[in-house]
Amino acid sequence: MKVLQEKILNEGKVLSGDVLKVDAFLNHQIDPVLMQEIGKEFAKRFKEENITKIVTIESSGIAPAVMAALELGVKVIFARKRKSLTLQDNMYVANVYSFTKQETNEISLSRNHIDESDRVLIIDDFLANGQAALGLMSLVEQAGASIAGIGIVIEKAFQDGGKKLREQGVRVESLAEIASLGNGTVTFVQHETAEVK
């Protein structure tokens, strides 16, 4: 997605060989026009999948998930990382290790909002090692719902999360795939395009 790649190049900051800071438009300050375009792109890619619900994780996945849900005409449910006083019982639970924060979080979804009749699109801001996506998949599977695919805003293709998910037969659609963050520079995966005659 060209507009996203340009935003990453212009406003993203490479902090190390595996950390990209995008707090100027995605995971702290949010660019609503960009989020709207991201939502439209996810909706376009998954429009034939009969999605009934979008599942994401708090908090950075919420904005792109809501915009995609708006385009698809479905609801969003986000996995919580902390227990809520109003949501104590009747929860699906999974553990997710965060390499960025170096901690394990117990994530949860209410059983009241997802069930076996749902066809789910999982959306998240980043895909690196795949832990968040695997945790969200576990919650959806516990509910007996089917997974249509995973939509990722930015995939760190140099890490193994995307490969692991695809090897499991999961459809993963990433809007920006980063090949490397070496020397303080973002390099995107180049996809060959077929020439139309």
Swiss-Prot record:
GO terms for biological process: purine ribonucleoside salvage; xanthine metabolic process; XMP salvage. The keyword Aminoacyl-tRNA synthetase does not apply. It comes from the Bacteria. Its EC number is 2.4.2.22. InterPro entries: PRibTrfase_dom, PRTase-like, Pur/Pyrimidine_PRTase, Xanthine_PRibTrfase. It is found in: Cytoplasm. This is Xanthine phosphoribosyltransferase.
